[in-house]
Amino acid sequence: MIVIPAIDLKEGRCVRLEQGLMEKDTVYNDNPGAQARSWQEQGGELLHIVDLDGAFAGVPRNRDAIRAIAEAVSIPTELGGGIRDLPTIEAYLELGIDRVILGTVAKENPELVREACRLFPGRIVVGIDARDGLVAVRGWADVTEKLATELAKEMEGFGVEAIIYTDIARDGMMGGPNLEATRALAESISVPVIASGGVSCLEDIARLMTIEDSGVTGVITGKALYTGSLDLREAVALTKGKA
């Protein structure tokens, strides 16, 4: 299992939201490139970037900050938020992003995901955000009636590289990850699942490691790293058996 530091971008700055609410944001760094370098230096093996403005607007909004991050690090990067067409996917891959995360479009235009997987094999990840097991879309603003496990199986059939599963009620609240829901999703498919939302401390990482055999290959953490309740070096050491 790998620990994946998150950089959420709003108006060109690194922020964290509580439960996906744009008005409940805390700014942690005005320099996204410097923040990315810091996570790499502390042992991060993959960077998770979210264009929050893009997620809510449905179009890219933080291209300069994203370029700065891609140029600042040598580790792989993945990016989501407002990516809803093939030209945007291609533009971000050409910008230096290693893999693109599709969220809302996976539910609303699944054929685009199928085509993206065909054109860019190994570089398409689907983010499934859920509340009470139901898929949420459009920056978490709308909760649908589709089960997260059902959508995950569809995406697996398209050939996505991985599924990022976020429990919205846990995200940014530091209440611990939803192990049961994450395990259930991972066991329903054969593609790797990355857990997201709620990690607050080293113990939460240890708990997630107990469901690694279900197919949970990584964990994304943001707020816990920024507030200091989780140390990235310690988390990486734990997952590598060196803690």
Swiss-Prot record:
- State any GO CC term: cytoplasm
Task: Tell me what reaction this enzyme catalyses.
Answer: 1-(5-phospho-beta-D-ribosyl)-5-[(5-phospho-beta-D-ribosylamino)methylideneamino]imidazole-4-carboxamide = 5-[(5-phospho-1-deoxy-D-ribulos-1-ylimino)methylamino]-1-(5-phospho-beta-D-ribosyl)imidazole-4-carboxamide
Coarse class of the primary localization is cytoplasm
Tell me one Pfam family matched here: His_biosynth
Keywords linked to the UniProt accession: Amino-acid biosynthesis, Cytoplasm, Histidine biosynthesis, Isomerase
Q: What is its EC number?
A: 5.3.1.16
Q: Where in the cell is it found?
A: Cytoplasm
Q: Which GO BP annotation is one of this protein's?
A: L-tryptophan biosynthetic process
Entry GO MF terms: 1-(5-phosphoribosyl)-5-[(5-phosphoribosylamino)methylideneamino]imidazole-4-carboxamide isomerase activity
Q: Which Gene3D superfamilies is this protein grouped with?
A: Aldolase class I
Q: In which pathway does it act?
A: Amino-acid biosynthesis; L-histidine biosynthesis; L-histidine from 5-phospho-alpha-D-ribose 1-diphosphate: step 4/9
Disulfide cross-links:
none
Root EC class: isomerase
Q: Which domain of life is it from?
A: Bacteria
InterPro entries in UniProt:
Aldolase_TIM, His_biosynth, HisA_bact_arch, Isoase_HisA-like, Isoase_HisA-like_bact, RibuloseP-bd_barrel
User: Which residues are named in the active-site annotation?
Assistant: 8 (proton acceptor), 129 (proton donor)
Q: Which family does it belong to?
A: Belongs to the HisA/HisF family.
- Name the UniProt record assigns to this protein: 1-(5-phosphoribosyl)-5-[(5-phosphoribosylamino)methylideneamino] imidazole-4-carboxamide isomerase
Organism equals Syntrophotalea carbinolica (strain DSM 2380 / NBRC 103641 / GraBd1) (Pelobacter carbinolicus)
